[in-house]
């Protein structure tokens, strides 16, 4: 029988635990009733994140799904509006269809390339002709995702994001960036977060993934976009102050893992795709082990992974 002394959980960067510094910050956090207008720790976090994002204001919410939903609904405040987004974007696949069921917003998908981008000309072709608004939804928003989870953590460059921003302005649209892992993209590209999201009218950033806070996501944008809607904020501040600098080491470890997996017969990793902290590996058809057998073997040895597809 295998004795597991330590479990290695590789399923997702969401399975993080607060550090001792975070726990201490939570214990001594100055709090108040945010509903009545002011929670000092929440206000400090929002001010700091607005500065980092290069935006006028920010708002703390419990989850990334909620943050993206709020952002889309603000930009598409009229029911029947349409948002253009990638067919493999997190908003489209993993967020319960909330923009449609709650907000009455219609998603119009454009094919995601392997690097997480969408072809600029395809985005433009997807924009509805306003002269036919009696028949079609009205396009009001374009959404990007950086880094792109389904593409293995690939990063959108400043040049690409700026081009999409220019396209949005040309057609009178807004641009939202799902930046759940925007700090990973910043570290990988060597570009400040504020520059990566400069073209965006709104951006979300998760604090509980690679940064390790217990929960929470920030929405940032203009003051008119953000209206005032912490214990958790205290931990999130520690995540910002202490853990952003550790992301580069996470990326290095991911590359080491990918290189090691690639040496195992029957497994394959496209190393060119490992830019940040996400590693996808394929189980080749001629492999001597099946997906289920591999997962059970790893779990028995204290290593947890998450399936993405039949052989991935």
Please place each PLM-identified region on the residue numbering:
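Conserved PLP-enzyme active-site core in the AAT-like
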Residues: 2-311
